[in-house]
Design a protein with these regions (language model features):
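Short Gly/Pro-enriched turn/cap motifs at secondary-structure boundaries
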Residues: 158-163, 229-231, 237-238
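Charged (Asp/Glu and Lys/Arg) segments that form or flank catalytic channels of large polymer-
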Residues: 215
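Short solvent-exposed loop/turn micro-motifs enriched in small/polar/acidic residues
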Residues: 5-6, 231-233
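Short catalytic/ligand-gating loop segments at beta-alpha or beta-beta junctions
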Residues: 209-212, 228-232
């Protein structure tokens, strides 16, 4: 719930500092995207020093509404502040899920805009690396007509290991390093961000095996992605990508399917029978990764 800050029936907003226990942050009635943006703006304003800083800003919108997060008799619908509805001439009682979703995304866009405006006001934009992405593809579970996003032409969606669940767009900005308007068609994944920010801030990452690689050489167009393989498991789903090839299964006891993503990004043409050697190579790579975990 974007106003009560409840997830799975429990309060899910906390405030904590280093060396102190995390405590619940009760801001009932404040829209979550605004709450998170306010916290980020406060952090940025307080950290305008010569020391590097890092701000992780995980908005929860537009995550799908869920009845488990609602009060009895409360409608299971997209939520947005009044101004977001008014932008399109709608009332807060708008019944069309698609239009309510539009208001939710608009409110998120406004919140992000306020954070970016703060960077401008602090004179920090030109020396700040910004990376914005989704944690998964749009949900396509057809729940009560509220799943609005589209992953076309990719197969599947959030909480699956099909490309529609794994492959998401991202927006990056770093003036003087990443060319404005440039498009990067190279595979990266979220573990890359830890290494990237550590390198930018001269922080020392843990001396353990890390799966991330610095993303800036790729985003700036100076080098291709160094990734050879990507490993995924979520609940019963599993997948591994090696170059342009990918294996995927939706249950541990079912056979793997094999797809060549460059020519078949929609994962419609299973190549497992036609390419048994390639299938065996990817299964071997998957087991190697699985052993490490």
């Amino acid at each position: 719930d974007y106003y009560r800050h409840v997830y799975n029936g429990k309060h899910d907003v906390y405030r904590g500092t280093v060396g102190q226990p995390f405590t619940e942050h009760h801001a009932t009635g404040t829209y979550s995207s605004d709450l998170f943006a306010d916290a980020a703006i406060d952090f940025i304003t307080r950290h305008q020093t010569k020391q590097p800083w890092f701000c992780y800003l995980p908005f929860n919108a537009p995550h799908s509404p869920n009845r488990k997060n609602k009060l009895p008799k409360q409608a299971n619908e997209w939520q947005a502040p009044p101004a977001a509805f008014a932008r399109y001439g709608m009332s807060e009682k708008e019944a069309d899920p698609k239009r309510r979703y539009m208001a939710t995304v608009t409110a998120l866009d406004d919140a992000i805009g306020r954070v970016l405006d703060c960077l401008d006001e602090q004179g920090a934009t030109d020396n700040t690396f910004i990376f914005c992405f989704s944690d998964n593809g749009a949900f396509r579970l057809n729940r009560e007509g509220i799943d609005m996003g589209s992953n076309e032409p990719l197969r599947g969606g959030g909480v699956t290991c099909w490309e529609g669940g794994l492959r998401v767009a991202a927006i990056a900005s770093f003036p003087g390093v990443i060319a404005a308007g440039s498009i990067v068609d190279q595979p990266l994944w979220s573990p890359d961000l830890m290494i990237t920010y550590a390198n930018l801030t001269d922080a020392q990452p843990p001396r353990i095996r890390l799966d991330g690689k610095d993303a800036l050489p790729v985003l700036s167009g100076r080098a291709p992605s160094k990734h050879q393989a990507f490993y995924f498991e979520f609940r019963k789903h599993a997948a591994l990508r090696l170059g342009d090839w990918k294996i995927v299964r939706t249950k541990p006891d079912e056979p793997w399917q094999l797809f060549e993503l460059k020519g078949d990004p929609s994962e419609t043409d299973d190549q497992s029978a036609a390419n048994p050697e390639k299938l065996a190579d990817l299964i071997h790579e998957f087991k190697s990764w699985q052993t490490e975990f």
